[in-house]
């Protein structure tokens, strides 16, 4: 997946130019016959979206996601409530605009020339490319030329349909495809994994997140170059909503909120390792059920799944692990650290987990209050890995190089510099393996995303199977029958507890239309 960057310069320039051009329509509160006035009179901003791991999702009824978070802040900016309608596919989203059922579409939609003929785009905030995917072990196409409708299926309203049509007319006359009116891109990727479908096309971000749970999904080839992602609103000559959006995004850019949201949802790294992800998910099935009670017992300020991800990064959940430098155990503690924590046996899993949590809490307590709450854990983990003194150096170096020392996105970019003499020679605490600390935190974030998504996928599958069995055996409750037939369901029973503090999780939902009020 190509590295994603929010287009801050573009947002700022576009906001300035359009604010001037649209100035006559900006006094939103003074007119009763414009779109902003209507939204404020109604008291709610109506946003239509779709369930994807990045765009909009829920845990325990609590919504989150990149587009949801931005939409909620925009509603707050306008002083109204947010009403979210979830649709099954992109085609239904644009139906909402056409029928007057939505003010905005916030769903990771790509900007293209066909859409802007009929709808008003907002500022772009990240970019994606469209990619053809297949299942590992199956035939990998090197070109679209010979694909047929029996092999290639895409979601309705997908932006790539226009690209496919152009390719058919100019380069691949034999190319054909089918549009499945009942499924979205995530469901079609599931069909590829399950062998029901040979190929589909999705955007690079969706694919990257999907692979964290389904590593057997592979990219065959890029269909397009990077394309900007934006929101859409009605194109009706009323520019008040567009002006408000530009002002909002420009303000978010200037105060650093856009950068923090990018880091939260897109900052976990681009590199996908098929073997490593597959090995990790196998360990989730084989090893984690025995360790889960310990992680739950000692996880206090952090989610137990984050603690599990840390332990896997440290030792691959091996209580007997030993490194050449002498660190040992589940949490790979040094002898001195273990002694300071009162640990008598570093290879005892419970002692090691307990000690590791206390040491991490100590690092957390040292992180300055100026660091945003949901980023403090990443600073603490880097300090856990390389020592808090070197974290102080990293923050100081960030400030000296015109970055924000309270922003994890800025600080992590400077971590590798701690091992380069031109930089560490001028720092208080000298040389550090900053590149290792960078990789350490990024790996933990990847394992965390995989773990949460995989557990939710397992829970969904077990629940669906239990419900099916309940239909066959109506005298037995679905829950008890599921636990009897699928013991893994007991392990998963609490896996959907609150997980919104530190980063987004994954849930490849099959829900159709629904509405949420916030």
Curated annotation (Swiss-Prot):
It is a peripheral membrane protein. One of its GO terms (biological process) is cell wall macromolecule catabolic process. The keyword Membrane applies. InterPro entries: Lysozyme-like_dom_sf (IPR023346), MltF (IPR023703), Solute-binding_3/MltF_N (IPR001638), Transglyc_AS (IPR000189), Transglycosylase_SLT_dom_1 (IPR008258). Disulfide bonds: none annotated. Its main location: membrane. The keyword Zinc-finger does not apply. Residues 22-269 are annotated as: Non-LT domain. Keywords: Cell outer membrane, Cell wall biogenesis/degradation, Lyase, Membrane, Signal. The active site is at residue 314. One of its GO terms (cellular component) is cell outer membrane. It catalyses: Exolytic cleavage of the (1->4)-beta-glycosidic linkage between N-acetylmuramic acid (MurNAc) and N-acetylglucosamine (GlcNAc) residues in peptidoglycan, from either the reducing or the non-reducing ends of the peptidoglycan chains, with concomitant formation of a 1,6-anhydrobond in the MurNAc residue. It is found in: Cell outer membrane. One of its GO terms (molecular function) is peptidoglycan lytic transglycosylase activity. Pfam families: SBP_bac_3 (PF00497), SLT (PF01464). Residues 270-518 are annotated as: LT domain. Residues 1-21 form the signal peptide. It is an enzyme of class 4 (lyase). Optimum pH is 6.5-7.0. Its EC number is 4.2.2.n1. In the N-terminal section; belongs to the bacterial solute-binding protein 3 family. Murein-degrading enzyme that degrades murein glycan strands and insoluble, high-molecular weight murein sacculi, with the concomitant formation of a 1,6-anhydromuramoyl product. Lytic transglycosylases (LTs) play an integral role in the metabolism of the peptidoglycan (PG) sacculus. Their lytic action creates space within the PG sacculus to allow for its expansion as well as for the insertion of various structures such as secretion systems and flagella. NCBIfam families: PRK10859.1. This is Membrane-bound lytic murein transglycosylase F. The lineage of its organism: Bacteria, Pseudomonadati, Pseudomonadota, Gammaproteobacteria, Enterobacterales.
């Amino acid at each position: 997946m190509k590295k994603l960057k929010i287009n801050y310069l573009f947002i700022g320039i576009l906001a300035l130019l359009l604010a001037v051009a649209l100035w006559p329509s900006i006094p939103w509160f003074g007119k009763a016959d414009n779109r902003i006035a209507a939204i404020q009179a109604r008291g709610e901003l109506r946003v239509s979206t779709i369930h994807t791991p990045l765009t909009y999702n829920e845990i325990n009824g609590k919504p989150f996601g990149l587009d949801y978070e931005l939409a909620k802040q925009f509603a707050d900016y306008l002083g109204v409530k947010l009403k979210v309608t979830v649709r099954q596919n992109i085609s239904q989203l644009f139906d909402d605009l056409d029928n007057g059922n939505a003010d905005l579409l916030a769903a990771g939609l790509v900007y293209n020339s066909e859409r802007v003929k009929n709808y008003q785009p907002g500022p772009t905030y990240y970019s994606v490319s469209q990619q053809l995917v297949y299942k590992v072990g199956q035939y990998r196409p090197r070109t679209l030329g010979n694909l047929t409708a029996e092999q290639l299926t895409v979601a309705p309203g997908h932006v790539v349909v226009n690209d496919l049509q152009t390719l058919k007319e100019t380069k691949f006359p034999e190319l054909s495809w089918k549009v499945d009116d009942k499924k979205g891109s995530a469901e079609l990727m599931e069909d590829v994994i399950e062998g029901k479908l040979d190929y589909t096309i999705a955007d690079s971000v969706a694919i990257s997140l999907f692979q964290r749970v389904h590593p057997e999904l592979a990219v065959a080839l890029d269909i397009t170059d990077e394309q900007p992602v934006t929101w859409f609103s009605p194109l009706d000559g009323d520019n008040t909503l567009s002006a408000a959006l530009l002002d909002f995004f420009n303000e978010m850019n200037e105060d650093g909120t856009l950068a923090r949201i990018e880091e939260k949802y897109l900052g976990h790294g681009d590199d996908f390792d098929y073997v490593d992800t597959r090995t990790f998910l196998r360990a989730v099935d084989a090893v984690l059920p025995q360790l889960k009670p310990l992680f739950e017992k000692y996880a206090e300020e952090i989610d137990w799944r984050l603690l599990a991800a840390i332990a896997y990064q440290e030792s691959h959940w091996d209580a007997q692990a030993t490194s050449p430098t002498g660190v040992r155990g589940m949490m790979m503690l040094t002898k001195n650290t273990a002694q300071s924590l009162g640990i008598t046996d570093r290879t005892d899993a419970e002692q090691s987990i307990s000690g590791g949590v206390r040491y991490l809490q100590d690092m957390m307590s040292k992180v300055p209050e100026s660091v945003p709450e949901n980023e403090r854990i990443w600073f603490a983990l880097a300090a856990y890995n390389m020592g808090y003194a070197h974290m102080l150096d990293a923050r100081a170096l960030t400030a000296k190089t015109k970055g924000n020392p309270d922003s994890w996105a800025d600080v992590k970019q400077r971590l590798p510099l701690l091992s380069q003499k031109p930089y560490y020679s001028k720092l208080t605490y000298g040389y550090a393996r900053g590149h290792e600390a960078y990789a350490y935190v990024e790996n933990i974030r990847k394992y965390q995303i995989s773990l949460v998504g995989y557990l939710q996928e397992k829970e969904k599958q077990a629940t669906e199977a239990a419900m099916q069995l309940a239909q066959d055996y109506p005298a037995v409750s679905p829950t008890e029958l599921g636990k009897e037939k699928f013991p893994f369901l007991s392990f998963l029973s609490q896996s959907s507890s609150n997980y919104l503090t530190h980063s987004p999780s994954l849930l490849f939902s099959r829900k159709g239309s629904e509405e949420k009020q916030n």
